């Protein structure tokens, strides 16, 4: 147990047992293999997410005593693993795996109404902003509008204006967001 505290060891063992016993739902992603469903507990998912709470309170799931498998088609398997791991964590920080999938988890946190995950992903996205991901982050911040994330992305774009003009990512962004160029221009050249 060299580097792990007793509390950490207990917590890890507790989660292992919890995930393996009395499972009442299995989750799959759009690209999950048939036998790769992730075991979970409705109560834990419901405690973290209002969407899951409403889903599991519906007659379809409430009346069923069999082990249900739910496909979350908007997520890839690796993202779903990080998503479920977060629901079983203390919610104080993102795991390294979650940090790798911060954009996808940010969207999932919005979709499944998990405010703490949404906030942590926003912080990670802002901390990792650079010219290669600024347009994608800006796009992500638009629906629903997230002012903090949008401002951070605009600032990154503004500071990288010379590289921006020839980027193919800009062309794709313009097609998907017709008002985007105007907003970017205003950010780069503010009126005095």
Swiss-Prot record:
PANTHER family: (RAPE) HYPOTHETICAL PROTEIN, BTB/POZ DOMAIN CONTAINING PROTEIN, EXPRESSED-RELATED. PROSITE patterns: BTB. Keywords: Ubl conjugation pathway. Pathway: Protein modification; protein ubiquitination. Residues 23-96 form the BTB domain. May act as a substrate-specific adapter of an E3 ubiquitin-protein ligase complex (CUL3-RBX1-BTB) which mediates the ubiquitination and subsequent proteasomal degradation of target proteins. InterPro entries: At1g01640-like, BTB/POZ_dom, SKP1/BTB/POZ_sf. This is Putative BTB/POZ domain-containing protein At4g04090. Pfam families: BTB. The BTB/POZ domain mediates the interaction with some component of ubiquitin ligase complexes. It comes from the Eukaryota. One of its GO terms (biological process) is protein ubiquitination.
């Amino acid at each position: 147990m060299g580097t792990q505290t007793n509390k950490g060891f207990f917590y890890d063992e507790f989660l292992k047992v919890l995930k393996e016993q009395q499972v009442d739902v299995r989750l799959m992603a759009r690209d999950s293999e048939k036998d790769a469903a992730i075991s979970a507990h409705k109560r834990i998912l419901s405690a973290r997410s209002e969407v899951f709470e409403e889903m599991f309170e519906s007659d379809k799931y409430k009346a069923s005593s069999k082990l249900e498998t739910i496909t979350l088609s908007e997520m890839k398997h690796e993202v779903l693993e990080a998503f479920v791991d977060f629901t079983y964590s203390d919610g104080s920080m993102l795991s390294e795996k979650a940090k790798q999938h911060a954009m996808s988890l940010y969207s999932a946190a919005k979709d499944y109404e998990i405010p703490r995950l949404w906030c942590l992903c926003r912080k990670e996205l802002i901390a990792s902003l650079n010219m290669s991901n600024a347009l994608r982050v800006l796009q992500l911040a638009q629906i629903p509008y997230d002012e903090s994330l949008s401002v951070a992305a605009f600032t990154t774009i503004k500071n990288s204006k010379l590289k921006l003009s020839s980027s193919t990512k800009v062309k794709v962004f313009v097609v998907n967001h017709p008002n985007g160029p105007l907003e970017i221009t205003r950010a780069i050249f503010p009126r005095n």
